[in-house]
């Protein structure tokens, strides 16, 4: 191993990096050393690094892997520069090829309706499942947000849901009529764990876990013919896709989803909630009306 590489790895070890991290740095920098052939990696130029990246890319290395290797090289040269062993960092101005953006998978409107409408059965768990998946699609919930919901997060009088999203940020989202109906049915049959604050419970009366929700949806998707690769986040993607198709209001959908940024270059844009509710009511396929029954049960 080159002396400079060895000292860099020792520096990382003293800094408390894990053995796994040390091995990754060593492999990434030794890879570059081997690609440089007669020249030491410590003396590489920006052009040579760019050529090395291009060669790895041509060999089929993923964008994620290229980015990791470039990051290792950049840290190595930064350390050399800080120690006075190089005047520049040849990796500082280089960027790995952008990662291929995988489009989120969403069900079509009729496919979503077919799945939700075919979740049948008379048991308490069936009622719970109908409520969960209607609510996920109605409000564009993340799985983590779904299982974190408590009973008092549902405002039955105004058909609103309080959601605790990423970073502890809360948002209010309208609940569609179909989801409200399913929620009331579920709460009417929710017999176990009455002292449990969680909105959705498992068989033993405790808060339902994310993996249980994933398995239940996968089982229902197979049973109803929707396919075996349906997962809760697909319902969130479907919510976003269908709302955009119907309303074209990207900023409103951003608010409803709880995204901090409209895009990588745009800051968070807050909208008036009344506008959000108007967009929601007019656009969501299963929220044509949000009724307020006189005999509301807020328990």
Curated annotation (Swiss-Prot):
Matches recorded under Gene3D superfamilies: 1.10.150.130, Intergrase catalytic core
Cell location: Cytoplasm
Record flagged with keyword Acetylation: no
Record GO biological process: cell division; chromosome segregation; DNA transposition
GO molecular function: DNA binding; tyrosine-based site-specific recombinase activity
GO cellular component, one term: cytoplasm
UniProt domain Core-binding (CB): residue ranges: 1-81
Assigned keywords, A-Z: Cell cycle, Cell division, Chromosome partition, Cytoplasm, DNA integration, DNA recombination, DNA-binding
Residue intervals of the Tyr recombinase domain: 102-281
Keyword Cell division annotated: yes
Active-site residues per Swiss-Prot or TrEMBL entry: 142, 166, 233, 236, 259, 268
Main location: cytoplasm
Protein function: Site-specific tyrosine recombinase, which acts by catalyzing the cutting and rejoining of the recombining DNA molecules. The XerC-XerD complex is essential to convert dimers of the bacterial chromosome into monomers to permit their segregation at cell division. It also contributes to the segregational stability of plasmids.
Subunit structure: Forms a cyclic heterotetrameric complex composed of two molecules of XerC and two molecules of XerD.
Similarity field: Belongs to the 'phage' integrase family. XerC subfamily.
Name of the featured protein: Tyrosine recombinase XerC
């Amino acid at each position: 191993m080159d002396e400079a590489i060895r000292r860099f790895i020792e520096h990382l070890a003293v800094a408390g990096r894990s053995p796994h991290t040390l091995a990754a740095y060593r492999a990434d920098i030794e890879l570059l050393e081997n690609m440089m052939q007669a020249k030491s990696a410590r003396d590489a130029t920006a052009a040579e690094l760019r050529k090395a990246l291009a060669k790895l890319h041509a060999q089929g290395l993923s964008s994620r892997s290229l980015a990791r290797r470039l990051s290792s090289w950049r840290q190595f040269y930064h350390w050399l520069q800080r120690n006075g062993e190089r005047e520049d960092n040849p990796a500082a101005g280089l960027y790995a090829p952008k990662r291929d953006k995988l489009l989120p998978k969403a069900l079509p409107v009729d496919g979503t309706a077919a799945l939700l409408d075919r979740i049948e059965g008379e048991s308490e768990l069936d009622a719970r499942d109908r409520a969960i998946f209607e609510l996920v699609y109605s409000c564009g919930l993340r799985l983590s947000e779904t299982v974190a919901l408590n009973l008092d997060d549902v405002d039955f009088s105004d058909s609103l849901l309080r959601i605790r999203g990423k970073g502890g940020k809360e948002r209010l989202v309208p609940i569609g009529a179909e989801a409200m109906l399913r929620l009331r049915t579920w709460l009417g049959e929710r017999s176990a764990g009455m002292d449990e604050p969680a909105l959705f419970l498992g068989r033993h009366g405790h808060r339902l876990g994310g993996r249980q929700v994933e398995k239940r949806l996968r089982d229902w998707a197979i049973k109803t013919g929707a396919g075996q690769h349906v997962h809760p986040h697909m319902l969130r993607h479907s919510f976003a896709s269908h709302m955009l198709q119907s309303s074209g209001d990207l900023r409103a959908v951003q608010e409803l989803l709880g995204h901090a940024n409209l895009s990588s270059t745009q800051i968070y844009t807050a909208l008036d909630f009344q506008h959000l509710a108007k967009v929601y009511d007019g656009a969501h396929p299963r929220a044509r009306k949000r009724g307020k029954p006189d005999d509301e049960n807020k328990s």
